[in-house]
Amino acid sequence: MGCKNLLGLGQQMLRRKVVDCSREESRLSRCLNTYDLVALGVGSTLGAGVYVLAGAVARENAGPAIVISFLIAALASVLAGLCYGEFGARVPKTGSAYLYSYVTVGELWAFITGWNLILSYIIGTSSVARAWSATFDELIGKPIGEFSRQHMALNAPGVLAQTPDIFAVIIIIILTGLLTLGVKESAMVNKIFTCINVLVLCFIVVSGFVKGSIKNWQLTEKNFSCNNNDTNVKYGEGGFMPFGFSGVLSGAATCFYAFVGFDCIATTGEEVKNPQKAIPVGIVASLLICFIAYFGVSAALTLMMPYFCLDIDSPLPGAFKHQGWEEAKYAVAIGSLCALSTSLLGSMFPMPRVIYAMAEDGLLFKFLAKINNRTKTPVIATVTSGAIAAVMAFLFELKDLVDLMSIGTLLAYSLVAACVLVLRYQPEQPNLVYQMARTTEELDRVDQNELVSASESQTGFLPVAEKFSLKSILSPKNVEPSKFSGLIVNISAGLLAALIITVCIVAVLGREALAEGTLWAVFVMTGSVLLCMLVTGIIWRQPESKTKLSFKVPFVPVLPVLSIFVNIYLMMQLDQGTWVRFAVWMLIGFTIYFGYGIWHSEEASLAAGQAKTPDSNLDQCK
């Protein structure tokens, strides 16, 4: 009896979401177009990083070769962006990576993904609000900070911030109110701020190339003079790549986080007029624009000023001052505030929508899924998430939580890539995701014979009898995916994830052992890499789904596997404290899921009700 109950619990945790076949039905307002999505993605991604991150990475990690670091980071981000793009075309519903996981790998993994996305967006909102407050305070002479230190100091070092940030709370309250008014209104404000930000960045790039000198990319150790009093700081060996290629890779790992934010586009599936095409285009276009901006600003910055003289906290004003053009700091300040505003809006925009999607599915408390009849926005979810973010911005220094935000985002990226890999090789399922990917015109052209054929394939009437053997794995006879080939891919994907984790652990924790040629490290690394290649080859040999989508990830399974590897490798770079905080957050989440979500899940209600026959499912999709 105990084994039976345990098996039933396992089936509950791995049940997959049945997606409604109707593309048009949505309780939210469909008012966004492709341009709105590009503006949202650029605004969310092209935030504070372009004004601060470039200086820190150039001085401490890569030097002028930061342009290559941004290129590598952009390529890694595009891998994740392509996977998001395919799922945006396949499942144009609100929920982003949470929904993608739900329809592919099951309820428990979906809850883990959604729970970590909520954490990432809340921390992102709080940290950017404090950065906006600090930037504005710096611009007007720091009166807000001085007042807080004199009258509102918090005596809890190591636990709370030195002073509460009232202005950050006010900013969050204003933007929360803006988001509750409606998507169209908030999208308009976002477009205005994004346009100003892009114009300022164009000014910076053009000025940098005009005022800069290529000699700053050809420096030697003899030029290390402006900071010669600081003997503890290392400036590398000069030249274009002063810290070597390892410094470029280290800089790329940091620059990767500058591209985080495009995933907010995927949360707008039920608010976009043509989601199957608009979401993939919005993701890829926003990443391309952001890369051009990062590349141009970092090149201009290192051309205007020697990399070892850059100010880590405010590199751009320092570079213009170095060129004798101190007045340009006001343009930089305006651009910085606009960038922080769009980044803040980009963090706040998807936050209530993920909560809404999870609450509507019954995994979070149902009242969070209520929609305002006039504005067609999830008002309660918006206000609740905004209140939590405001409290965190008011009380906490968020330096230690930045990595925690990254771990949640990287986990979501990894799961989306795994979902693309698995779903591409599964048999067609008209009552789930397959019909969701088809347009209305295509559905009209599908006749009953095609649907019956797909149904027979699902229920096991395969054109070729399949038995488990090495030949059936390496050289399958079926042209279309079957239950057997889908099972092979599922098992292979799980094994591949374990092997990639092993490779990343050895590469990060056993770096010195590998460098010294220690036998165990070399053996484990070599064996794991070879097995990864073998398993990837097995997946590649399986028949691929012929479902027509408006966008598909190219070079499957190689690109999703590369995306998973990059994301897990970056997760392994995070410190132990981050993993401990991650475990605490997950403990809270599991308490909610096993105490409430698993029993109130909409999929559980469907399973407890009448079981739908294949014929009824076909009728629903017709």
Curated annotation (Swiss-Prot):
Residues 1-35, 83-102, 184-191, 261-280, 352-377, 423-485, 545-552, 599-622 are cytoplasmic. It catalyses: L-arginine(in) = L-arginine(out); L-lysine(in) = L-lysine(out); L-ornithine(in) = L-ornithine(out); L-homoarginine(in) = L-homoarginine(out). GO terms for cellular component: apical plasma membrane; basolateral plasma membrane; membrane; protein-containing complex. Glycans are attached at residues 223, 229. One of its GO terms (biological process) is lysine transport. One of its GO terms (molecular function) is virus receptor activity. The keyword Cell membrane applies. Keywords: Amino-acid transport, Cell membrane, Glycoprotein, Membrane, Phosphoprotein, Receptor, Transmembrane, Transmembrane helix, Transport. The modification Phosphoserine is found at residue 616. The keyword Transport applies. Residues 58-61, 124-162, 213-239, 301-330, 399-401, 507-519, 574-577 are extracellular. It comes from the Eukaryota. Its main location: membrane. The chain crosses the membrane at residues 36-57, 62-82, 103-123, 163-183, 192-212, 240-260, 281-300, 331-351, 378-398, 402-422, 486-506, 520-544, 553-573, 578-598. It is found in: Cell membrane. It is a multi-pass membrane protein. Highest levels found in the testis and bone marrow. Not found in the liver. Interacts with TM4SF5; the interaction is negatively regulated by arginine. Forms tissue-specific complexes with ASL, ASS1 and nitric oxide synthase NOS1 or NOS3; the complex regulates cell-autonomous L-arginine synthesis and citrulline recycling while channeling extracellular L-arginine to nitric oxide synthesis pathway. Belongs to the amino acid-polyamine-organocation (APC) superfamily. Cationic amino acid transporter (CAT) (TC 2.A.3.3) family. High-affinity, low capacity permease involved in the transport of the cationic amino acids (arginine, lysine and ornithine) in non-hepatic tissues. This is High affinity cationic amino acid transporter 1.
